[in-house]
């Protein structure tokens, strides 16, 4: 919700928080988080293939909503420790070469299963199914409008192993001379902050002028 206001403020779109809330289906939010954090996905670790099952669900969701991949397919494949892994990357509207780009992302992976016991699965509802559902639903909302910038969305692999997925996508986008204006990453937003509802905490403040643009 906050991000849509941020982007709208950058481009002059008149969208109130109440108007945006009315278009976000909370039942869909709960459903997606429940699926991504279910025991059947085994903590979304690529070693036990839980990540691949989660990715299959996300890609099916994107296809069902007529969303287009940024590249030829949704999977942005890279190799980690000689094992194939991939980010999931898509775009809002048509991507135009040379145009400034905003990247909105979150990591899809989690830490899998640890030890043996009745509750040994790290389900990762907050870390980071909450961030993933935000990216999915924000993308759907933004697709209703036309923007002056490219908007790319991504769910990253292997964040828990050292930001490997986002690193590989950043390296690829730099090689392709994609002109990134802002990168906004959602992490563990499933719990309300003590400072109040609809408040966010922005890290990397000193790395860009995003806060000044919003204000």
What is each PLM-predicted segment?
Residues 36, 62, 79-115:
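Acidic/His- and Gly-rich active-site-bordering loop/insert found
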Residues 31, 98-102, 147-152, 178-182, ...:
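Loop/turn elements at helix/coil->beta-strand transitions in domains of secreted/extracellular proteins
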Residues 1-20:
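Bacterial Sec-dependent N-terminal signal peptides
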Residues 84-87, 118-208:
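Acidic/histidine-rich catalytic neighborhood of metal-dependent amide-processing enzymes
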Residues 44-93:
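A non-catalytic alpha/beta surface segment that caps or lines the substrate-entry region
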Residues 16-18, 22-53, 65, 184-191:
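N-terminal capping segment at the start of a domain
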Residues 15-23, 39-49, 76-79, 117-128, ...:
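Second-shell loop/turn segments in exported
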Residues 34-42, 59-68, 91, 137-147, ...:
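Sec-exported extracytoplasmic/periplasmic mature domains
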């Amino acid at each position: 919700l906050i991000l849509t206001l941020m982007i709208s403020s950058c481009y002059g779109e008149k969208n109130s928080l109440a108007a945006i809330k009315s278009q976000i289906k909370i039942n869909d939010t709960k459903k997606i988080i429940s699926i991504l954090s279910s025991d059947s996905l085994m903590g979304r670790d690529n070693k036990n293939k839980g990540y691949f099952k989660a990715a299959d669900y996300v890609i099916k969701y994107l296809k069902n909503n007529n969303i287009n991949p940024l590249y030829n397919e949704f999977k942005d494949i890279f190799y980690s420790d000689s094992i194939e892994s991939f980010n999931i990357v898509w775009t809002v509207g048509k991507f135009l070469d040379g145009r400034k780009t905003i990247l909105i992302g979150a990591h899809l992976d989690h830490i899998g299963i640890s030890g043996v016991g009745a509750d040994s699965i790290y389900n990762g509802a907050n870390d980071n199914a909450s961030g993933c559902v935000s990216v999915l639903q924000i993308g759907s909302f933004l697709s209703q409008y036309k923007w002056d910038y490219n908007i790319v969305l991504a769910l990253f692999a292997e964040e828990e192993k050292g930001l490997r997925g986002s690193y590989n996508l950043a390296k690829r986008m730099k090689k392709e001379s994609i002109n990134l204006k802002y990168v906004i990453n959602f992490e563990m937003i499933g719990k309300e902050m003590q400072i109040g509802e609809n408040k966010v905490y922005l890290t990397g403040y000193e790395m860009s002028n995003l806060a000044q643009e919003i204000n």
